[in-house]
Curated annotation (Swiss-Prot):
UniProt family annotation: Belongs to the PsbN family.
Topology within the bilayer: Single-pass membrane protein
InterPro entries according to UniProt: PSII_PsbN
Signal peptide span: none
Keywords: Chloroplast, Membrane, Plastid, Thylakoid, Transmembrane, Transmembrane helix
Coiled coil: none
HAMAP family: PSII_PsbN (MF_00293)
Gene expressing this chain: psbN
Species of provenance: Chaetosphaeridium globosum
Transmembrane annotation, as ranges: 4-24
GO BP term (any one): photosynthesis
Record's protein name: Protein PsbN
CC annotations in GO: chloroplast thylakoid membrane
């Protein structure tokens, strides 16, 4: 394979992995540890 194709595949895999991790952090098990500043604010 050409070097350019390998670089594109590597960057694509990196982007998909990062997106999956951020979705897991936002909606998965670790989301219970995130704080909500709107919940902490009292009127």
């Amino acid at each position: 394979m050409e070097t350019g194709i390998l670089v594109v595949i590597f960057i694509s895999c990196l982007l998909v992995s990062f997106t999956g991790y951020t979705i897991y952090t936002a909606f998965g098990q670790p989301s219970k540890q995130l704080r909500d500043p709107f919940e902490e604010h009292e009127d």
